[in-house]
Amino acid sequence: MKLVCISDTHSLHRRIPDIPDGDVLIHAGDCLGQGTLENVRDFNDWLETLPHRHKIVVAGNHDWAFQETPELAREALTEAIYLEDSGVEIEGVRFWGSPWTPVFMNWAFMLQRGESLYEKWQLIPDNTDVLITHGPPKGIGDEVMMGLKGQNVGCEQLLGRIQQLSLQAHIFGHIHEGYGGYRFGKTDLINASTCNERYLADNAPIVLDVHPQKG
């Protein structure tokens, strides 16, 4: 199964120069620019033009419509499977999606580090194959520059849960500077941020293959 991974498009989805075909298109959050229902409808119209047989979306901290008017936002997103602390199995591959990130200023889907996030990550089933979260785990694709010094701002509790799982892949975004592929044990980790740190949609979609588990 070929996964095509994007994230953090911030309503600039039409500026992505080329989106490879694949079995499942995954958007790891921050699909919206202003966070409005109109943004959701525009994003959905664009998804309809893409050839992928399956499309999965999780929300991010800019995606206010999914937090403030969740029923209306989900109704508007007819072209994708929306995951919020929920999962779906596609052709034998088990996906789980979650929007939460550690608190930073006043954005959507944010929780305090510690117990609140720990409880969310404990909802991830042990048999998950592909995890989709908006934010990164601590120390992987999560470095931002604070003055002259880099700082890892990912979630410690998410890293702890990943260490307990046998994931094939973990797909996220949120930290634009961390775009790229990483490896943690036997797990492929993908920071699929489409927009760079200047909010230009310059980063290419990342493609990877996963396989149904036997037995």
Which residues does each predicted region cover?
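Active-site neighborhood of phospho(di)ester-bond hydrolases with catalytic His/Asp-centered motifs
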Residues: 5-7, 25-30, 56-61, 83-84, ...
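Binuclear metal-dependent phosphoesterase catalytic core
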Residues: 87-91, 157-165, 169, 176-215
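Charged helix-capping and loop-helix junction motifs
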Residues: 40-43, 72-80, 112-118, 148-159
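Core catalytic region of metal-dependent phosphoesterases/phosphodiesterases
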Residues: 6, 11-90
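Active-site-proximal segments of metal-dependent phosphoesterases and phosphodiesterases across multiple
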Residues: 32, 37, 104-105, 127-168
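Short, conserved loop/helix-junction motifs that constitute active-site signature segments
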Residues: 18-20, 47-52, 74-77, 124-125, ...
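Active-site-proximal beta-strand elements of phosphoester/diester hydrolases
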Residues: 1-10, 92-101, 129-134, 188-194
